[in-house]
């Protein structure tokens, strides 16, 4: 068994219930990451008999997007997984397009997953996505770390729906190597390499980089942060002052977001006002 498949199955074994009759939904763009998570889901479901449904969002932002939707549906069919195509209709914004597309995608996926009776949506984020988020946070973007298990970010359409990321510890290169070994092709969206977008620039800056382990200062800072019964946070002053300033600032951003219930990290300037 390959390392990506083993890692994904281990997460599924911990997070998913084999006995449930509800289908497992998979966000399936047809790209390499989502194809990897579809293979993991297929292997896990084969052992317990749970039904699967793939959901493909056609954003309509590329000239070939309709062709990609049909291609993704055919890819899923070859794995005996039904695939529903969802389309982002209406006018598209001229600014803030990535954020608007992401919000529309989450909304469409949540609606379709719940209509299918699914309570879990598998998403193909990898360790590279986690690293890209860290680079973007360092540049001031209000993006938090990805979680293996988290509630749908849309409300009320995503009520009762959870996102599971089985490949969050897997490097994208290792995942692609597995797909190549299986003789599988995937869709490459040129937008992933468009440096007009912050994530593409972060991806380019990380090309070939190894993941960094948390430093002792970061681990001490995490240990010094405790949630209170009333919904706030207590952060040890000594650990906060001893931590590298960028990491201390990001902890304050996250604490503000959690305590306030905001959907994204607080802006750096707001967090700096606390210190």
How does the language model describe each region?
Residues 201-215:
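Extended, highly charged alpha-helical segments
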Residues 5-30, 53, 88-90, 153-160, ...:
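AMP-forming adenylation/ATP pyrophosphatase catalytic core
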Residues 185-188, 212-217:
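Short, structured loop/turn "capping" segments at alpha-beta junctions
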Residues 1-205:
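Core alpha/beta nucleotide-donor-binding catalytic domains of modification enzymes
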């Amino acid at each position: 068994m390959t390392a990506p498949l083993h890692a994904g199955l281990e997460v599924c074994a911990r997070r998913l219930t084999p006995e449930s009759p509800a289908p497992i939904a998979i966000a399936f763009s047809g790209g390499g990451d989502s194809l990897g998570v579809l293979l993991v889901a297929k292997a896990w479901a084969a052992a317990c008999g749970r039904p699967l449904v793939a959901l493909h969002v056609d954003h309509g932002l590329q000239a070939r997007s309709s062709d990609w939707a049909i291609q993704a549906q055919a890819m899923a069919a070859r794995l005996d997984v039904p695939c529903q195509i969802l389309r982002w209709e209406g006018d598209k914004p001229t600014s803030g397009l990535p954020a608007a597309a992401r919000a529309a995608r989450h909304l469409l996926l949540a609606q379709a997953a719940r209509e299918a009776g699914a309570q879990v949506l598998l998403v193909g984020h990898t360790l590279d996505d986690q690293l890209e988020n860290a680079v973007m946070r360092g540049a001031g973007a209000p993006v938090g770390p990805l979680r293996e298990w988290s509630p749908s970010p849309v409300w009320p359409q995503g009520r009762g729906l959870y996102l599971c990321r089985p490949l969050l510890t897997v490097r994208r290169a290792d995942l692609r190597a597995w797909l190549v070994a299986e003789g599988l092709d995937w869709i490459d969206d040129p937008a992933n390499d468009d440096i007009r977008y912050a994530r593409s620039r972060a991806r380019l800056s990380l090309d070939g980089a190894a993941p960094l382990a948390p430093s002792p200062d970061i681990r001490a800072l995490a240990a010094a942060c405790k949630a209170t019964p009333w919904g706030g946070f207590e952060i040890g002053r000594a650990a906060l002052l001893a931590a590298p300033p960028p990491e201390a600032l990001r902890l304050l951003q996250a604490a503000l977001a959690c305590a306030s219930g905001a959907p994204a990290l607080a802006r750096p300037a707001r967090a700096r006002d606390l210190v």
